Amino acid sequence: MSMFWGLNMKPERKYSQTIIKSFHISGVALDKGQEAKLYLAAEKQEYIVATVTKAIPQVALDLNFSKGDRIMFYTAGDASVSLLGYLHDIDSEDDEDDDQMTIENLLNSKAIKNSKKSEDDEDENESGEEDEEDTDDDSQIIEEYESFLENGEEEDDDDVDEDNEESGEEDEQDSDDSEAEEEQPKAKVAKLSPGASAKKSGKEQNGVAKKEEAKQQQKKKEKPEAKKEQPKAKEPAKQQPASKDPRTITGGVKIVDQVVGKGEEAKQGKRVSVYYIGRLQSNNKTFDSLLKGKPFKFALGGGEVIKGWDVGVAGMKVGGKRVITCPPHMAYGARGAPPKIGPNSTLVFEVELKAVH
């Protein structure tokens, strides 16, 4: 059972929170004043969600937010607005703590909703029966959602600093390991160097001793060459270099592989899971993204997404990253996808293939 959720926003005020229970926003309505623009800030990006005026006092929305997301709402204008929605039923939530909200109606909304519906059916089959939450717990959650905290974005910067420090330590370890690997062959060659001194001392011995030393010296010369070649055998384990030159494929779609994956290949008819970020080629402005949490799933070649994705994702391997440039007729065409995507827009997607099912 879903429970009502609402928030009254005053003009020029910011409301931010780390989400503790998934919820859905169904619409925004003008309260008092002439006009207000509703903004959403998430994942270091800002989005214009809706504009309400005296002429258009109410706008329907379809936004879902998951537990663990860090979001902030704020308005511009002289009017106060009301956000309306509902809390998701606890029994239907996944156990993942860092699922990310994505504005999926911007990427072939109807098809993606159908895809998400099939995903929910799969999750229900796997989850089994769960105990119902007490009414008192739901009431407490509603009270927490009614009071958004103001100016809570500083915590994100701290998290980023900690992540940078951790990644820095990992880079140092990787550097130390690689240096140690490169030094190993040199150490082996150094152990063989006493043969040179043995050669000098051998000159003072008889002819038989010199012949024995010559044979040993020949064997030692062959061994260092074999050992020096050992590091080259490790090179295939490194990430395969990707070509930066764009390739034009079906429908004029251009692809550039930034990272070539090593896992299973994405083929027509397979279901794939991806992270992505979409930008307008005209101004490089981000209109949609999904970079963490539960990846987006769809059937490749099944018409569930834009044509540019059906042909552009094909051939990728798990772990790979690819830039896909979709001309208008392989994206949203002359209609576009207002308000974010205008008519005849060329779209650029950075796609990472996470899994092939």
From Swiss-Prot:
The keyword Amino-acid biosynthesis does not apply. It comes from the Eukaryota. PPIases accelerate the folding of proteins. May function in a signal transduction cascade during early development. Its EC number is 5.2.1.8. Ubiquitously expressed, highest levels in ovary. Residues 113-251 are annotated as: Disordered. This is 39 kDa FK506-binding nuclear protein. SUPFAM superfamilies: FKBP-like. It is an enzyme of class 5 (isomerase). Belongs to the FKBP-type PPIase family. One of its GO terms (molecular function) is double-stranded DNA binding. Keywords: Isomerase, Nucleus, Phosphoprotein, Rotamase. It comes from Drosophila melanogaster. One of its GO terms (biological process) is juvenile hormone mediated signaling pathway. Residues 222-237 have a biased composition (Basic and acidic residues). GO terms for cellular component: chromatin; heterochromatin; nucleolus; nucleus. It holds the Pfam family FKBP_C. Its main location: nucleus. The gene is Fkbp39.
